[in-house]
Amino acid sequence: MSSQPRGSGTQPGPSQSPISQRNFRYEPARSGYTSPGQYSTYSTSTADRVGCLTAVRMSAFAKLSRFTRRLVHIRQMDFEFALWQMLYLLIQPSKVYKNFIYRKRTKDQFARDDPAFLVLLALSLLFSSIFYAYALGLEKIGFFTFFLWSVFVDCIGVGVVIATVLWWVSNRFLRKVRDQDVEWGYCFDVHLNAFFPMLILLHVIVPILYPTLIDSPAFLSILLGNTFWFLAACYYVYITFLGYTALPILHKTQYFLYPISFIFMFFVATLTGGWNISRTALNFYHSRAEPHKFAPQHGGL
């Protein structure tokens, strides 16, 4: 009877090494944002099926519904924090985006879930419209028309277009991880952040100075008025750059600064050509708010 050496069936040979039997596979780069339980539940409404170690990832529709519900509950809005954000957008905008990163780690979203900032921005547009109504000599109906255009077209409408374009560009070309993408709501928040300093420059300072210092064909008047438009555009681009640079899932965000070069060349061209941008803009605003005053008159001889 032949006997087999003890342990001969259990000792692996050179080709049977546990290390050589491991299956190695390529793992794509990840963002590092994981739930405590290393998995998440994708929810479209409530979190009744979620355990204590599971993070909830709400759908875009669920986030929008929650945002809309809070829009009609004034007591749930944190206006004090929204005012703090507005202040630091003027003096230290990079500090504002640190809160967006904290929100991602605690609520699994970069975008704001509190509509207080949007409400205060609309109120700012309401009060700034008073300055334009005075500078343009608008009537009551013209004032409200100007305000509605400013909110729903200049702020929200243009913001939706810009946010959609940058959302697509960021996810298509600038994303360096696969397990996270840029939220459209965050892109719209970046637009609102960049829009507020522009509002202060163009909707407060320009209409105040326009009747006395800007509304003139003199070079200094053109230089002063066009400088405000140049600064507003550069500030918008810079805060937009900061917003996308704050996302750890993106790279090559320096591309967002490239428009500043074209803005500067356009600024120099307007000064060389003697084009008063403020005059053109205010005439356009006036014709939009009170179109009946700019309608062509058809009268017989």
Curated annotation (Swiss-Prot):
UniProt similarity note: Belongs to the unc-50 family.
Origin: domain of life: Eukaryota
Organism, as annotated: Caenorhabditis elegans
Gene this chain is encoded by: unc-50
InterPro entries in the record: UNC-50
Protein keywords: Golgi apparatus, Membrane, Transmembrane, Transmembrane helix
Entry protein name: Protein unc-50
Membrane topology qualifier: Multi-pass membrane protein
Sequence ranges on the Lumenal membrane side: 137-142, 215-221, 276-301
Keyword Lipid biosynthesis: no
Subcellular location(s) per record: Golgi apparatus membrane
Parts forming coiled coils: none
Keyword Membrane among UniProt keywords: yes
Primary localization: Golgi
Chain residue ranges for the region called Disordered: 1-22
Spans within the Cytoplasmic topological domain: 1-115, 164-193, 243-254
Single Gene Ontology BP annotation: regulation of muscle contraction
